[in-house]
């Protein structure tokens, strides 16, 4: 059995960041044949690594985990993340919406920078189990076992499983006594109770989705069975099972304006002109208007038009979206983790970083930022003990 001062399980964003910040005596074990597969698809392959905001604003994008992430974000804010990558040879750029990317807009450049580590990396090696033996952790793989006084579990969540995020870390954490908050998809496409194939691929730049008291406005893209895009993905955090969702395409609209247009004109064409919504989307929403002219629209039809454009009610859920969701909500209970060091409060020498923890952020680089920041604090604490 080989002994290392530190063993890291997981070669994703947080595991690689941690490895790069530790001495060369550390060992990182990755189950896939290549590290960082999920990094490569982040931000549509462009790697939105963080967001240009001050920490006090930044932490508001983590839903109910603002307090838990605060020290990490203040310790390793966006500016320090940019400096880290600059030192690794990767310049970054701020988009007009505040999202920060490598200047090349190539996620592979981010992965290459993270791979510049002095630590040892083993790939293609799934971990079977972990256990505590006195003051040491034993990490068992099919071929061999490793012992270490410090163990970091950085295996990610349970989404995009083809990248290796299959939820193994939950089993490891649970076997060491930790509570797992039920994992489910977040930053996920939303499925709705109607076939949206006819409008698949149509993008609407500003739509408001309302779920109870939660309201988010941004763009959406229609999929075969619902929506994706920032608005859908951000509100998916609160969807648990089948839930009524209200879709508002416009802030206000008076259907009576149709009657002010040429009476012989097509209602669909008129609506597209008045609302700036795509013709094909309006045909999908109002099939009963396809062959009607403006003059023939009834009072009841005008009411339906207003109701649908201002508050289209659908039944939404995020089931069966694990392979499309970008992150996982749920994971290791934050109440059992020291938010200043990311060490377990239950098991000395055990650390958790990144998406494995019950923390998820909004779209815009917040999840990668947390992966990096949690690794930064864990590395600071680990260096003091090895």
Model regions: which residues?
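A conserved short coil-to-beta-strand element within the FAD-binding core of flavoproteins
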Residues: 123-136
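Short hydrophobic core segments
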Residues: 7-9, 29, 127, 146-162, ...
């Amino acid at each position: 059995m080989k002994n290392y001062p530190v063993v890291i399980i997981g070669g994703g964003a947080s595991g690689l960041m941690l490895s790069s910040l530790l001495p060369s005596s550390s060992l990182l074990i990755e189950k896939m044949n290549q590290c960082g597969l999920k990094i490569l698809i982040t931000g549509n392959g462009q790697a939105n690594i963080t967001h240009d905001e001050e920490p006090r604003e930044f932490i508001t994008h983590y839903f109910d985990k603002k307090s838990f992430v605060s020290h990490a974000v203040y310790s390793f804010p966006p500016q320090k993340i940019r400096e880290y990558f600059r030192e690794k040879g990767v310049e970054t750029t701020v988009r007009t919406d505040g999202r920060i990317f490598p200047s090349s807009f190539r996620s592979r450049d981010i992965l290459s920078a993270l791979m510049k580590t002095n630590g040892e990396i083993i790939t293609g090696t799934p971990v079977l189990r972990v256990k505590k033996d006195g003051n040491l952790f034993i990490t068992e793989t099919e071929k061999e076992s490793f012992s270490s006084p410090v163990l970091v579990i950085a295996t990610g969540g349970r989404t995009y499983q083809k990248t290796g995020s299959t939820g193994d870390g939950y089993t490891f954490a649970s076997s060491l006594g930790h509570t797992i908050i039920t994992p489910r998809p977040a930053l996920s496409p939303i499925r709705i109770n109607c076939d949206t194939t006819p409008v698949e691929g149509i993008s609407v730049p500003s739509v408001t989705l309302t779920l109870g008291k939660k309201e988010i406005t941004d763009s959406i893209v229609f999929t075969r069975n619902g929506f994706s895009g920032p608005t859908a993905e951000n509100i998916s955090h609160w969807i648990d099972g089948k839930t009524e969702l209200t879709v508002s395409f416009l802030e206000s609209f008076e259907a009576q304006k149709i009657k002010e247009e040429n009476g012989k004109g097509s209602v669909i064409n008129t609506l597209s002109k008045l609302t700036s919504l795509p013709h094909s989307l309006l045909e999908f929403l109002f099939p009963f208007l396809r062959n009607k002219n403006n003059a023939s629209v009834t009072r009841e039809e005008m009411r339906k038009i207003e109701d649908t454009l201002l508050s289209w009610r659908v039944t939404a859920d995020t089931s069966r979206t694990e392979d499309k969701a970008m992150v996982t909500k749920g994971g290791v209970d934050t109440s059992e983790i020291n938010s200043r060091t990311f060490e377990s409060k239950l098991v000395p020498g055990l650390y958790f970083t990144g998406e494995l923890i019950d923390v998820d952020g909004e779209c815009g680089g917040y999840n990668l930022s947390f992966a990096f920041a949690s690794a930064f604090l864990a590395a600071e604490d680990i260096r003091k003990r090895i």
